């Protein structure tokens, strides 16, 4: 297991992070579980803690965040609004995949604005909505090229759509990221200018309404006054060895004491079930929250 740690502060003042203590606490949690768990934490845009970041992890539906940003950038470049309507033939959609959109729209031809497709992917992790946007708006290759302008080229790869991965589950490993790259992307989303203000705010708001994976990073945060979370999950298949290929969550959290942090947790090749994988993520989230919220008045 490769462990890494880093801590810096741009303003030269005191840090909100006891990086060594966090690193040790997270490493102890990771060691409790039968799988590879990678973690990256960025606090206030400066302090960084990573565990098992040297390896890459299947993103699964986390890549729908990358897709959303690529769609928004393409629409910015072409002067298009997210109100632009896309029409889909129901027969072209996959009835077997996860798709709240397909359940909620029974008409033979489904016409929806792009912003609704994005909401389906970001809030509900809808696979059909994602496939439609890859086919008609921005391809997986073009998404990969755009994200490479935001993140180090070697830190991630997007090669396949949800449809591609459904046809061959091994392809999930080709859509990969380091935990730090995922944490960097969500951190930049909330602190930098990546696309037009209106579209960027739209993506941020959608992530704050995410309905999936509330038993992961969000679990220890829900119900705490003044705490906000925006996140995107990814969930994988069971492979031929009976392992859970991936169980992920990437989040941006604001605390009432002024601390803001991005946290990425990726679980790979897990010899347990989804409940145990979610528990590992929630425990890591709880440890981070406990330390960073310590000085809330």
Task: For each feature predicted by the language model, list its residue ranges.
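Short, well-structured active-site flanking segments
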Residues: 73-93, 140-144, 196-200
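Conserved catalytic neighborhood of penicillin-recognizing serine enzymes
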Residues: 93-131
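Mid-domain, small-residue-enriched loop/turn segments at the edges of structured enzyme/sensor domains
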Residues: 36, 110, 131-194
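Structured C-terminal helix/loop/strand segments within mature extracytoplasmic catalytic/sensor domains
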Residues: 13-33, 135-136, 140-141, 188-227, ...
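Bacterial signal peptide processing site
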Residues: 8-11
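Active-site SXXK
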Residues: 58-88, 121, 263
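C-terminal motif of bacterial Sec signal peptides marking the signal peptidase cleavage site
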Residues: 3-6
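Short, conserved catalytic-motif segment at the N-terminal edge
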Residues: 32-57
